[in-house]
């Protein structure tokens, strides 16, 4: 079944039988039994006892993957499955012009071309390891409703059609072998309304044969019903039990009031199952979907205005224009991505950096090169990132970050007077790092926060050095600044990283009045 544009249509006779999930009573009872075992209850008072794992606070850098059927049209963004059905959009017009009427070639018809025939999960994991990633979060299911894992709750999954393999499970196994912590993301909640545009005109969304894929296709203004909420919960439970992710990332829309009791049940179930596994886990959430302190807050394409007292996360992409593979990406520069990492870490956050693989299972050469370049920088400068904590102040300089979400629309040009700070305390001593965001034209870094006048350094400086093999030519400390004269830049995407080794703190001598 081939369309005029050359892509094969989905053969209805090739579909596996639909899965009956109309009665979830037994599955929900198993969830509630696991919650009853504790230690967490499904109420916010109990869930606020959660503590962010040390491994996550140390990790700092992870890889996000938006892979799926939407990479086949490779047009606009990962929301193509929605916007192609919204009349008046450029995606709708593009689809008509390229693939014909939506009733004859719908979103489902991209599935046969989503083959991932060149997929090499071990090579992917090795690339992520070279990039310096400590954890990986592949999309388990996006808004389109196509599961990238083997599922007993839907026939629309990668193990039964398209690639015909458990691509999520294969990547997580390869990540284990590369000592990368496994995670997964769920974007299922929005599927309640995601395909609703196709219900307003003659399209395959109206075909009852595909209701279990395109549905519910309800209005966004309406609250999800009990069946959708239970299915969301049990699909997520399936991911938890089958793959045991240590990071579980949720997209928006679970902050809708109807989700609240189900979110609490899910969190208690996940935390209790992790306790049974002997694993420390993380839930990432947006907006106000979770009570403060019960999980890890996530900002999309943004940053904080200052240091947050508890760990958080910034999820962003190598592309300014899309999260999935599309033709004609507007890529960020490597320097911009490293600055995002430094900025996030200086404010007590982790950076989750997204790439979008192609439908043949390969990663675009440009995206591979970006990851390799980040890894090369971290190989020489990672001491200022991994395992660090925020210093007294996060940043210095004239170019301040814009706080909030979706603030990466254009590259910000930093100066050599812009710094981000981190600190480390371990058995070898106390250290403070100043990450310069640009190289000084005159060769002198002037770090005002290290001047004697501000009194921000509690200890004397034992030594000053540069990470990454750079050379310190001279050091002068005045009331106004620490001035570090450095050699020529060695091709780093950003400026030098200054390392201060501080003298040990002076501990007051104890006077023993009883045995003096």
Predicted features and spans:
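Mature catalytic domains of secreted/periplasmic carbohydrate-active enzymes
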Residues: 2-516
């Amino acid at each position: 079944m081939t369309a005029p544009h050359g892509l094969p249509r989905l053969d209805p006779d090739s579909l596996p039988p639909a899965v009956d999930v109309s009665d979830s009573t037994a599955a929900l009872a198993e969830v509630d039994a696991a919650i009853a075992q504790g230690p967490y209850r499904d109420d916010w008072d109990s869930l606020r006892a959660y503590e962010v794992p040390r491994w996550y606070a140390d990790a700092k850098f992870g890889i996000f993957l938006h892979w799926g059927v939407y990479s086949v049209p490779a047009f606009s963004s990962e929301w193509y499955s929605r916007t192609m059905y919204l009349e008046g959009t450029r995606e709708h017009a593009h689809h008509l012009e390229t693939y014909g009427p939506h009733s004859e070639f719908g979103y489902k018809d991209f599935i046969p071309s989503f083959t991932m025939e060149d997929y090499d999960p071990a090579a992917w994991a090795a690339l992520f390891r070279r990039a310096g990633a400590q954890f990986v979060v592949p999309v388990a299911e996006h808004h389109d409703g196509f599961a990238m894992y083997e599922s007993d709750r839907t026939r629309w999954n990668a193990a039964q059609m398209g690639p015909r393999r458990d691509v999520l499970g294969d990547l997580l196994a390869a990540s284990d072998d590369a000592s990368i912590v496994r995670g997964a993301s769920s974007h299922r909640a929005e599927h309640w309304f995601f395909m609703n545009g196709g219900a307003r005109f003659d399209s395959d969304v109206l075909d009852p044969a595909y209701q279990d894929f395109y549905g519910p296709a309800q209005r966004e203004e309406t609250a999800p019903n009990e069946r959708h909420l239970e299915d969301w919960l049990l699909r997520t439970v399936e991911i938890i039990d089958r793959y045991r992710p240590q990071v579980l990332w949720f997209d928006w829309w679970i902050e809708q009031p109807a989700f609240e009791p189900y979110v609490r049940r899910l969190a208690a179930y996940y935390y209790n199952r992790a306790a049974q596994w002997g694993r420390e886990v993380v839930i990432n959430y947006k907006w106000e979907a979770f009570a403060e302190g019960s999980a890890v807050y996530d900002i999309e394409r943004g940053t904080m205005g200052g240091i947050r007292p508890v760990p958080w996360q910034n999820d962003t992409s190598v592309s300014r224009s899309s999260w999935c593979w599309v033709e004609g990406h507007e890529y960020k520069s490597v320097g911009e991505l490293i600055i995002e990492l430094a900025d996030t870490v200086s404010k007590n956050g982790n950076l989750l950096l997204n790439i979008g693989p192609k439908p043949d299972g390969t990663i675009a050469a440009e995206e591979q090169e970006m990851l390799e370049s980040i890894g090369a920088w971290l190989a020489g400068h990672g001491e200022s990132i991994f395992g660090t904590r925020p210093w007294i102040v996060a940043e210095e300089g004239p170019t301040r970050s814009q706080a909030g979400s979706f603030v990466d629309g254009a590259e910000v040009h930093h100066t050599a007077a812009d710094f981000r700070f981190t600190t480390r305390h371990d058995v070898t001593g106390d250290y403070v790092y100043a990450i310069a965001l640009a190289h000084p034209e005159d060769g002198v870094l002037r770090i005002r926060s290290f001047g004697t006048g501000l009194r921000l350094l509690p200890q004397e400086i034992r030594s000053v050095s540069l990470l990454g093999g750079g050379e310190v030519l001279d050091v002068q400390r005045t009331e106004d600044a620490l001035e570090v004269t450095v050699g020529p830049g060695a091709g780093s995407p950003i400026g030098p990283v200054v390392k201060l080794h501080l003298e040990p703190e002076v501990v007051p001598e104890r006077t023993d009045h009883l045995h003096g």
